[in-house]
Amino acid sequence: MPGPLVCDIASTELTDHEVARIRSPLLGMVILFTRNYKNPAQLKKLCDSIHAVKPDVLIGVDHEGGRVQRFREGFTEIPSMHTYGELWKADPEAAARSLTAAGYVMASELRACGVDFTFAPVLDLDWGKCEVIGERAFSLDPRVVTRLARALSQGML
């Protein structure tokens, strides 16, 4: 059973030091960033090498769409979650359908490369006061956030 710690890696290939760290019984997850990505084939090779070291370690990425999409070349560009919140105002059903489709695409592309999960959806409310959240949030309305997060999650299953 993997442990509670999360680590990152420095580049697009594992070093001997990183292999040793991944083998630690305390490590449960490796998080990837843009610096770990060149293209889908390289990402698949990296994820395969991580899982070869420790098959039960999780590989995650902050890949939400919009400006927080760590892998771009070879991946479908997913709009920001705020875009779907705006669509909700005009057509809630279309927003939910679009998000379910986006979730499917996002998860399918990540899984094809060996990534186990993404830190999406963001459930923060958009109070309009935090640039870090901004377009990452669906809406200020918690009911809208709940419905849209559910739609995205259903697509990711």
Name every feature range the model reports, one short phrase each.
Residues 1-15:
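Boundary/entry segment of secreted carbohydrate-active catalytic domains
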Residues 3, 16-19, 118-121:
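N-proximal short alpha-helices
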Residues 14-31:
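N-terminal glycine-rich anion-binding loops that anchor highly charged ligand groups
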Residues 148-157:
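Phosphate/pyrophosphate-binding betaalpha-module
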